Each structure stands twice: as C-alpha cells, then as structure tokens.
Amino acid sequence: MVKILVLALVFSLAHAQDFAELQGKWYTIVIAADNLEKIEEGGPLRFYFRHIDCYKNCSEMEITFYVITNNQCSKTTVIGYLKGNGTYQTQFEGNNIFQPLYITSDKIFFTNKNMDRAGQETNMIVVAGKGNALTPEENEILVQFAHEKKIPVENILNILATDTCPE
C-alpha cells in the first residue's frame, strides 16, 4: 500500500504544474493543523473554499473562501504569489506559505504554513473537493501527509457538513 501512495504522490507532483485542474468551484472537505485551536469551529483558519482561479500561468492563484465568525459567514479572497520553490505566499491572519501537493480532477490537497501576527506558527493541510467525501485511498494519503507535517491524526477534521455559507 505504501508503494501505491508513493506512486500516487509522484504522479500528482509530476502533474502539479498542470494547474488547469485547480481552477473552478471547490469546497473544503477536511482541514488539519498542529494547532487545533486555529481550525476548530470559530477558529481564524477554519475556512470554507468556494473558488480557485489561476492567472499569469498560475504564478498568481486567487482563492475565494468563507470564514465563520460569530455565526456570520465572511467572504474573503486572497491572491497567492508563486515563489521559486513551487510554493505560494499570501496574507491572511498573518503570513501564509501554501502549496498544492496532490491534485486530481475532484480533489486538491494543500499544505499551508501560517505565521500569525503574534509569531505563532501553524502547519496545516486543507483538502478541497467538488463535494464528495474522501475515498479510503485519499484518506490514507491525508494521514501520510499529516504524519510528515507532524500533525496529530486526531487533529484531522471533516468540516464539509459544517459549511453553511452561501455558494
């Protein structure tokens, strides 16, 4: 099974530069972080994806999402700027360095490192999809990424059902 996961990762990374699959409507399925407080309900980094666009050969990635604060959905759009190492940088609740790691036609696994204004670092994994839950194979990939990022498995939250924000 590990060989399958490695092959899936290699395949997805080899095709990661074909960002056409990234564009369109997306929903946050799962979010995980080494700092659970940041992604719990009402947490500043618990975001619900809505749309991704790429510009300038995807050197700029625009992500539109909602954050729920005080039971109110707040729509936000950020633009990530591609860095030389394949990561993107943007500002939201501090500085964020993110990267799409695993891409299929209906799922995207992102890693994100957030450094908030107080200097606290939070390592995250965000899985966006077209509305379907993770398959058992995708869940194994998620758990593997969580181990690599030192994110406890119990900090993996399925949040698709808690998304009450507008389309």
Curated annotation (Swiss-Prot):
Modified positions (Pyrrolidone carboxylic acid) in chain numbering: Q17
Tissue: Expressed in the vagina, uterus, and Bartholin's glands of female hamsters. Secreted in vaginal discharge.
Alphabetized InterPro entries for the sequence: Calycin (IPR012674), Lipocalin (IPR002345), Lipocalin_CS (IPR022272), Lipocln_cytosolic_FA-bd_dom (IPR000566), OBP-like (IPR002448)
Glycosylation sites: N57, N85
Keyword annotations from UniProtKB, A to Z: Disulfide bond, Glycoprotein, Pyrrolidone carboxylic acid, Secreted, Signal
A GO molecular function held by the record: odorant binding
Localisation: Secreted
An annotated GO cellular component: extracellular space
Signal peptide: 1-16
The keyword Coiled coil is annotated on this UniProt entry: no
Disulfide cysteine pairs (residue numbers): C54-C58, C73-C165
Glycoprotein among keywords: yes
Protein family membership: Belongs to the calycin superfamily. Lipocalin family.
Function: Acts as an aphrodisiac pheromone, reliably eliciting copulatory behavior from male hamster.
Record protein name field: Aphrodisin
Organism ancestry: Eukaryota, Metazoa, Chordata, Craniata, Vertebrata
